[in-house]
Structure formats: C-alpha cells, structure tokens
Amino acid sequence: RLSELFEQARVRRQAAAPLAAIGPAGVGGVAFVVLCLAGALASDRRDAELRLLLARGGSRAGIVGRLLGEGAVTVLPAAAAAAALAVLLLPTPRLAPALLSAAAVTLLALLAFPVRAAVLLAPPRPAARWRRPVGELLVLTVTGAAVLEVRRRGISPAGSDVDPLLVAAPLLLALCGGLLLARLQPVVTGWLARAAGRGSGLIGFLGLARAARGSGSSGARARGRSGPSVLPLVALLLAITTGGFGAAVLQSVDSARLGVVRLTVGGDAAISAPGNSPLPDGLAKAAGELPGVRTSVPLWIDHDSFVLGTAQGTTQVTLVVAEPAAYAELSRTLGCGAFDPALLAGGGAGPADAPVPALFSADLARQATPGTYVLRAGSGGELRARVAGVVDCTPAQPGPGGVTVVLPAGPATALIHGVDRPNRWFGLGSPAADRLRALVSATRPAAGAAAPAAAPGAGRYPTAQALPVDEAYPVRTSAEAVAELAADPLQRSAQRLFWASVAAAAGFALLAVLLTLMRNVPERAALLARLRTMGLRRRQGVALILAEALPHTLAAALGGALVAAAAVALLGPAMDLSTLVGASVPTGVRLTAGPVLIPAVGLAALVAAAVLVEAATSGRRQITTELRAGDQR
C-alpha cells in the first residue's frame, strides 16, 4: 500500500512539473532579456573608453578579460550572497537545482557586458541583409515545431520528464510576437508621426518621430549598428504572455474545480436526509430564504423505483421529483442535463390517469419502447409516464451510468406517497455553511417529539433522530469542497509558484523599460535643454518624453494580449489540468478576456507610471549644465 502511495505521488508530481515550470521559464526569459539589455547599456556608455583602449594598442582579448575581472568583483559576491540567502530562506534537501540555477544566472550576468563589448570592438563587416530574416525564420520554425508537439503530445505527456521545448512553447510564441512587433511598430508609429505632423502642434510629432526611428543617435547607432530597442519589447511581451497564459490556466483550474465540486454537491449547497426520510418541516423553504441563495430546489429522490414496460420488462431507476423551472435552472448552471422546463409542463391537465411527462436518462431511453410506461415508486403508488425528453445526466445523480427518471412536482404529488415531503434540497448562489447548519439544528425535531412519518421502505435506514445533526442532515457547500480540493500541497504550491513568477516577470519587464529609459537619459536631457532655450515649457518636455516612450509600451501591451490569447488558443486544448484541479476533468484551457487583458493593462499602467516619473525627473535638469562647452552628446 505504501509503495502505491509513493507511485501515485510521483505520477502526480511528474504531471504537475511541466505546468509549474512554465511560470519560472517565463521569468528566466525576461531576466535573460534584462541582463542582455544591461550589457548593451553598459557597452554603450563605455563605448568611447573601450575604443580608446583598442586604439592605444590593447587587444580585444585583453579588453574582454579586463571587463570580466571588473564584473567578477561585483557579480561573484552578489551571486554567492543571493544563493546563500535562497538556501537559508528556502531550505531543501536537494541543493543541486538551486546551485545550478544560481551558477547559470551568475555566468550570464558575468558574460553579458564582455560579450557585447567584444561584438562592438569587432572589425566592421559588410552588412548582411539576410542575417535578421534567417534568424527570425529559425525562431518561427522552432516555435512551430514546439506548438505542433504540444498539440500532439500535450505539455505534460504521461510517464515523461519535463521537456524544455514543450515548456518553452509559450515563450517562443512571445518571442515570435516580439520580433513581429519590432517590424510593425516603427512603421505604424511613423504613420502616426506623419499624421501628427499635419497638425499645428510639434510635441506629438517630435515624440512619435523619435519613437519611430529609435531615440538616440550616438554610440552604436552612429556607426550603423542597430540599437537594442527590440529587447524591451520582447521583455514586455514575455512578461505579458506569461502572465496572461498563467492567469488563463489558473482561471480554468478554478472554473473546472468549481464545476466538479458543483456536480459532486449537486449545486452550491445541499442538505440531505438519511434514506427516504423527509427533511424537517419548513427547512427547504427557510433555506431558500437565506441570504446568498439565488435558486432554491427542493426535491424528492427515491432509489428503489421501477419502470415497467421497458425492453427488459422491469428496470430499477432513481426517481427524481422536482419543480421543473427550478430544476432546469440547476441543470443548466451545473452543465448537467440541461432541458427546457416546458417539456415537463401539461402533466396536470386532463384525466387523472393521463401519462405524466418525464425525462429519461440516456441509458434508460435506450431500453425504452414506444408508448407509455408504468412507474412504480418504492415509497408506494404508481403512475403512467411518457418520455418527454432525454438527458445525459441530472444533478440529483450526476455520475455516469445512472438510470434516472425526472418527474414534475405538481402532477406527481398526488400519485406517489411521500413526494410532498422533500428529502433533498439543492441551492445555487453563495449561502454560508454555518447558517445552513444553524438552520438545520433549529428546525430538527426535538428528541422527545414525534418523528414525521417516513415513507414506506425507509425502515432499513437509520432514523434522523437517532443520529447526530451533522450525520442526520449533512450540509455540503461548494465553497467548502473547493477549499478542500485546493488545500492539496501540490496544487497550492504550483499556484503560488505561478503567481510569484508572474510578479517577478512584471518586475523584470519594468526594469527593462527603465534600463531603456536610462540608456537615452543623457541624449534626451540634452535635447530637452536645447528645446527649452527655444521656448519649450517644462510640461511640454514631459509630454514629449511620454509621446516618445509610450508607443512602445502600448504596442507591447496590445501585442502581449494578442500573443497571450494566441497561446491559450493554440496550446490550451492540449493541457490536462486534472492534477492541478484535484479531479479528473476534460483537457483544455478556456480563453476568456479577463485573464488576458488584466496583466496587459496592469503592466502597461505600471510602465506608464514609471515613464511619467522619469520624464518629470528629467525635466528638472539645468539648462546651463546640459549646454556647457565641449559637450560631446
């Protein structure tokens, strides 16, 4: 038995590992972009110094070695302290993954600046126009292969370890979106700049024109190299795609978990009586009047009824008697056997022996023959019924293979013994479990009081008065069942890891935008100072910086939302969420607007606020400082 539990835990952990790895992979991708951007910023700032060293006889290898030494002074102690802090705060018996991750980050941080400097100091070569298209085509090919593999095998194939290609599929889609956006954004911004140029104002035209061609004309750009303007777009797209895809997965998990729980409970709340014993008088009505109850469905269930006249002669069924409109709403909300309540109407008209309309389960309908049937209840009494509709399941008995018959409460009440006293109550809404239990305790018959007459055949079940209140009339709510399912450590850890990854990716994306702004601070401050001498007001300077920086942010937010939606549409149908839900559910992630738009709008607002603060700070620089003699910017 213990070995089976260990094997079950191993299989669940193996199934959840790829889903939990998507978030950290997104953080790693954004962090990689940020480190590359930091290396580009450092190399641009020290470009003149490095070229001077090369002109004075220094070799490229010597300069790169010097930069490695400079970086080691700060990177190695910081990496060691960070790794030690991680081990102390989050102790684990297996240190190898943590140490390997720390070593990879350290190596990347140490090499980003020297590698960028080595590229800048390389002898100029003829521009190869095919280099960028070939690289983009390679990324597109790898992305297509990853998406096809995910659609074919799923993100977490049974019995296999984490496949990096499958886990990286959302990130590759974001990378493709970033490359496409880097092609389209300058063109669209250029159109907007030309449209703004036809107006009377100059602020919008200048800002959009600088955004279209890329701000800054010094450093690497002045020598014909393209600046790292695509990196902030990629960072924002990675963060938004990771956040949107992760939020869609988590919402689908919550939705699927609620759906499973609702089917298990029978709604958002349920009260049942033991056996065929009825609920206390007035309990169903009082429960329906509690705050938070949207729909009240009292019903009567009998598992010992029989249908006479089927292909097998006599078939034992579960008989459900409920008010048609309320039961139809319950079925529609639960997604279990939805039907039109008009199908069960008309059973009360006509002679007393007229057949009552009934809903047959699919299994029973396959045994049915044309005509009417005799329905004999286990509590006593019988009636004639006709098939008014077929349902594949019903909330009163949602399990597969159930043979059920649903009757309307009105016509059946006078023909079946005890059906006027419901023995089940289902509710929709958000009722409080403690209020329901208090209501059950208040309406339960006293120990010395006469018990209500039970239906015939209920004697083999324990009476309600002989049981504790929690066992006599058990109360179940979907909120408690969802909390119980979500309390699983594996699911809770995966969910927390996902949200932590989304927050970290957003932080790194914001850092990427700030690094981009810092890269152009000297040139932008000099431009503002010169424009101030020509009558530019401080408020107009802030507007100019916003007009220059916000098109990138808005384009990244819109593109990230579209890429996140594409990732959910392409990869979602292949994701099995059963491990995260805690129960077997159909494969697939639902695409909804909320989880995709909220990360995009939130990150765009955060970046816009950071740009506004930087713009207001840059506008306070002194003109005399920026226009000093000998300024080389």
Where are these regions (language model features)?
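Juxtamembrane segments of multi-pass membrane proteins
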Residues: 155-173, 177-346
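Short helix-loop junctions at transmembrane helix boundaries
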Residues: 71, 80-99, 150-165, 561-602, ...
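Alpha-helical transmembrane segments of integral membrane proteins
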Residues: 20-37, 78, 104, 139, ...
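Short cytosolic juxtamembrane segments of multi-pass membrane proteins
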Residues: 122-128, 619-633
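Hydrophobic secondary-structure segments that place a key small or acidic residue at a functional site
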Residues: 339-411
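Interfacial "coupling" helices/loops that link adjacent transmembrane helices in transporter permeases
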Residues: 33-72, 511-554
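Membrane transport/envelope proteins' first extracytoplasmic loop
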Residues: 1-31, 99, 155-167, 180, ...
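Hydrophobic alpha-helical segments
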Residues: 51-54, 58-185
